[in-house]
């Protein structure tokens, strides 16, 4: 896998180091922080990190930098630098019913060459095939396995430090490689709170849930069963969670517009299809309600839509770049 993703891995390595330098973040500090997650990574996944290191020649802890970058940046550095008014980087929009879910993947447009969709099969005692989006060596919770467990998610920036539990990327791999249903997937995703994330998860039986998580105990997650449709963006819907947001106004207009569009489609015939999800995710009116964000060719550090996915228990529609009807499809 490391060899096939070599270009993306080397590119992300260069970008993360450059961003750290631009923000006056010491690589020594980053290395110290990411090493704190080491004890929470199962041995099989340490072997995975070592395998990428061997395949690419990038040192182990530099691969770890990629695997843990979102946990370190948003779980530790952003809360620690609250007075610095660090920019909102993520703008993902996740939408789902009990049968179909999808999302856009939005980050700095400079991240475009780091992305790839990856399909792989683990040939263990019970083989499992996984399809998900990767950013260098980092796996984001946006994919499906051949047991028809599906997950999408988005980052929520708040000012509470995360724990040093299992990193998001590793949890995502574990969930998609082992879960047979929504409950098993959810248990893994709630096993640590390294940052604030929302998830939508469903399975072949239509056991859909929409989840909000935040990094404090005892009320660090909120789970809603999906009865019609649910939308999750880069904000919290629970007032006690929203109190801790870095920017309480961020993503509210996009949240409202996505809810409006999803409910309109669902109310039309009592279901939400993968094609309707693609249509919703193409919405762009040039305001903060926009879901499909065009890149700014003059500013690669401006957020844009870099990829998207729409899936049900039969197939996955996906693409890199802006959401469009020109998507790939995998039956899985």
Predicted features, each with a name:
Residues 1-95, 176-332:
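C-terminus-biased signal that marks the final domain/tail of proteins
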